[in-house]
From Swiss-Prot:
One Pfam family hit: Ribosomal_L2_C
PANTHER family membership: LARGE RIBOSOMAL SUBUNIT PROTEIN UL2M, RIBOSOMAL PROTEIN L2
A GO BP annotation: cytoplasmic translation
Keyword RNA-binding: yes
Species the sequence originates in: Zymomonas mobilis subsp. mobilis (strain ATCC 31821 / ZM4 / CP4)
Quaternary structure, from the entry: Part of the 50S ribosomal subunit. Forms a bridge to the 30S subunit in the 70S ribosome.
Record keywords: Ribonucleoprotein, Ribosomal protein, RNA-binding, rRNA-binding
Top-level taxonomy: Bacteria, Pseudomonadati, Pseudomonadota, Alphaproteobacteria, Sphingomonadales
Family to which this protein belongs: Belongs to the universal ribosomal protein uL2 family.
Chain residue ranges for the region called Disordered: 32-57, 221-278
Gene that encodes the chain: rplB
Name of the protein described by the UniProt record: Large ribosomal subunit protein uL2
Alphabetical list of InterPro entries matching this protein: NA-bd_OB-fold, Rib_uL2_dom2, Ribosomal_uL2, Ribosomal_uL2_bac/org-type, Ribosomal_uL2_C, Ribosomal_uL2_CS, Ribosomal_uL2_dom3, Ribosomal_uL2_RNA-bd_dom
GO molecular function: rRNA binding; structural constituent of ribosome; transferase activity
């Protein structure tokens, strides 16, 4: 998908750059593959605000996307590529030979009418899913499982991908976009190709309202508040906060390490933080 640059016919159009979605499906999603979605406004079940900057936005239906791809050896045909308000990537509606419909993440270079298949070993072709241990070295993949049959968890955002760089004792080594290298079990499923809509990050919304349509509220800096409202607040004149960045509740933020799953540290060959540690 290309980027669309708008002429400044009004202040809200000056500098506006959006992804050209003219080739996407213009109708409604498949009703059987959608669910209702309640907005939380960033509040938990007690009504306490746990996430800042969330609220409002256009009403959305949740699309049931198949991240598992476990319908073995049954070819499917791409019916259409659709916009999905719940994620940055596009989704593809596919119809299997038994006439069942399913949504999958749309990879780059996948078009209407293309045939795809999920198998233990499949051709290296965008949209095909296979066990990562069967894919050749150097293959670009996305929607990567961390546990067999759990469904893809890595490389699902727009433009994301990982590359297979090696094999070792029933494990496969992959390199992620972040620079992290890690082991994945060879019987985990992956989908060939990079995720669609790689230009998503290059958009310029040009006005605050477009962020509000997406449910994003303005965020006030802590240093602009009073001491009662934020740990960075107060001070005479402009100050820098005087401490490492924290949330309104005093917890470290902006790059602070929060990873606590020590059990899977052994699968990480090279941390994405390796450059920062030097």
């Amino acid at each position: 998908m290309a980027l669309k640059h708008y002429n400044p016919t009004s202040p809200a159009r000056r500098g506006l750059i959006l992804v050209d979605r003219s080739s996407l499906w213009k109708g409604s999603p498949v009703k059987a593959l959608t669910e209702g979605k309640n907005k939380t406004g960033g509040r938990n079940n007690k009504g306490h605000r746990t996430s800042r900057g969330i609220g409002g936005g256009h009403k959305q239906k949740y699309r049931l996307v198949d991240f598992k791809r476990r319908k073995w050896d049954m070819p499917a045909t791409v019916q259409r590529i659709e916009y999905d308000p719940n994620r940055s990537a596009f989704i593809a509606l596919v119809e299997y030979e038994d006439k069942t419909l399913s949504y999958i993440l749309a990879p780059q270079r996948l078009g209407v009418g293309d045939s795809i298949v999920a198998s233990r070993k499949a051709d290296v072709k965008p949209g095909n899913a296979m066990e990562i241990g069967q894919a050749p070295l150097g293959t670009i993949v996305h929607n990567i499982e961390l546990k067999p049959s759990k469904g893809g968890q890595l490389a699902r955002a727009a433009g994301a991908y990982a590359q297979i760089v090696g094999r070792d004792k029933g494990m496969v080594m992959i390199r992620l976009n972040s620079g992290e290298q890690r082991y994945i079990r060879s019987d985990c499923m992956v989908t060939v190709g990079a995720v669609s809509n790689s230009d998503n990050a290059n958009q310029n919304f040009a006005k605050a309202g477009r962020n509000r349509w997406l449910g994003r509220r303005p965020l006030t800096r802590g240093v602009a508040k009073n001491p009662v409202d934020h740990p960075h607040g107060g001070g005479e004149g402009r100050t820098s906060g005087g401490r490492h960045p924290v949330t309104p509740w005093g917890k470290p933020t902006k790059g602070a390490r929060t990873r606590s799953n020590k059990a899977t540290d052994k699968f990480i060959i090279r941390s994405r933080h390796a450059k920062k540690k030097r």
